[in-house]
């Protein structure tokens, strides 16, 4: 996995009437002071600095310096803040991917869905999520799924949904495009860009300072450099690995995955990019025995072993899709194995990044819904770079949803931000030979 969500970050041209903002320095950022009050914000600048402080928390913990805050739009009351938590530190030193979906915005939406009734929180339309960087496809789709307003500080011209700074969201299909236009706003910057987008966001009539904008960029780029230097090597090629399914020494690896998925390593296909009927039957059975589930996703390692699979839990949490749970399960189990001195060596001899494996959907995502686009974005966040090999695809499915055609599913990919369309080259493919 190439975990860098926004390695090629630059600040795009400003919105209409604004000035271009140059790329931020990758030197040492100035210390980010703690807000005087993290319980309430009183304007756009204090909201932006709260998000910046949250981003710094992510960087300080060894992950990316991107963060967000969830506030009541009318009052400025802060409900929650979340930094990026994709990476965690290891007991032996260095960092490792723990959850490829743990971007701040996605975590905020999962928290809101889990706490809304218990805490009596206001409706999504009365809330604003402010984020230090334009949301990636996964996070934007999570925000659209819930229906909150979104205030953005800095543009991301590589993976952000407003990557071209036009505010048209032409990279998204309808009805997502119209929904983004109605809920996403980009704060004006003193001496720089004009406001762009929806006026429904908190403090839409107030600008932020260029210093805060610059600090958001510097915090991210510096943290990305630190992640690259601190992360433990994780992308071993299959030729250098030992098949855990046939290696008696890998029993602890197998048992770790069987805790949540008892069938782990009991199915092995001849070619890892050619799922067979047994994989289909396993996913169908998983849905059948999971109350309320309608979909399941499995992960095949480069040796063809069905390592893990998950059914969706969307009745519990809309963002608990089968893919999100599956990719999270693989990453977190792998992290735990690498983080233990007893299993570190065998884990590194047996497991590698998902780019070398295959994700198999029982039913492909519906790209015309925010939930479906969430899965496509989460796949991109998981991979971070091209699959190896690229053909056959590492993104496969047995069935299509409703009236969606294979052509429509692929056509949605082409306009997506460069990370997804040019780098990863996401290419959903129907499983061959299984009816």
Segments and roles (model prediction):
Residues 9-13, 17-20, 30-435:
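Zinc-dependent deaminase catalytic domain
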Residues 1-9:
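Twin-arginine (Tat) signal peptide motif
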